[in-house]
Amino acid sequence: FLFIGDGMGATHVAVTESYLSHKAGKLGGEQLQISQFPYYGTATTHSANRHITCSSAAGTAIACGEKANNGTVGINKDSVEIESVAYALKKDGYRIGIMSTVPINHATPASFYAHSFNRGNYYEISSQIPASGFDLFAGAGFLDHKDKAGDKEATDAYLEKNGYVVSYGIEEFKAESEGAEKVVFCQASNRNESADNYVSDGVEEEDATMAQMLELALDFLGDEQPFFIMGEGGAIDWAAHDNRTMSMVENVIDFDNAVKVAYKFYLEHPDET
């Protein structure tokens, strides 16, 4: 498992834990799961060409092991396409799952399967999914569902033509993923196609939490082969950009709940995880 809290730092964690402590009637002491692990580390986060990174440069650095220029996806500072850890593991026989709480072709998840000089080329990025051969993608649909010229087929139709079962919502995914080789899970409402929609704005019951998405991924990927799952809490950053503190807190909690699912899996499979 690799979990990325997009835009999340120590302050986001501290604010969330303060909220949880207040909710429990305490002055402090409530901890997220991510605060309870025995080891911590810090890292510099500047990109190859900016003091302040962006999600695509940071995602590329995490996924591919090289610093990149802001705005680029899966391309190093010398303009060379570089391979992500997900591709390396796929070659070694791992099943691969890429999931996010924001659109699947957004910067961080894209860094694990795509190459682009412009993180905003959303249609081009999602069109690279079939070439990856990855087994599962999950998130809040896709940005730019059609190409900018409007003369190419919609992303979901393109993916289905190229071997992926595309489903919307939990129940549809459960029904249609049975027996499928490669799947794409999209939120039923695709609410995160706009950064104006957050948990506290009202969530439709049919939309999955990050923990639920991870449980779907674990059920689909199974235990017959080793697997790798990258899970991004992308809406943490979106809420923070808009100064929506409560939405940020809710999304950190959502992220942490997914980590709890993974940690439970580890406790049940300590030798393999």
What would you call each of these model-derived segments?
Residues F1-K148, E153-S177, E181:
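N-terminal catalytic scaffold of extracellular/periplasmic and nuclease hydrolases
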Residues F1-M8, L89, C186, F227-G234, ...:
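Beta-strand elements within well-structured catalytic alpha/beta cores of enzymes
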Residues A10, D254-T273:
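Metal-dependent active-site segment of extracytoplasmic phospho-/sulfohydrolases and closely related
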Residues D92, L216-F220, A258-F265:
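Generic, well-ordered alpha-helical scaffold segments in large soluble proteins
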Residues A107-F112, S189-G202, Q225-P226, M230-Y263:
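Active-site His/acidic residue clusters
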Residues N118, E206-L214, N251-F255:
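Phosphate/oxyanion-binding active-site loops and adjacent basic polyanion-contact surfaces
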Residues G169, F173-C186, M213-G233:
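Active-site regions of oxyanion-processing enzymes, predominantly non-cytosolic
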Residues D201-Q225, I236-D237, D271:
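Accessory "access/gating" subregions that flank catalytic or transport cores
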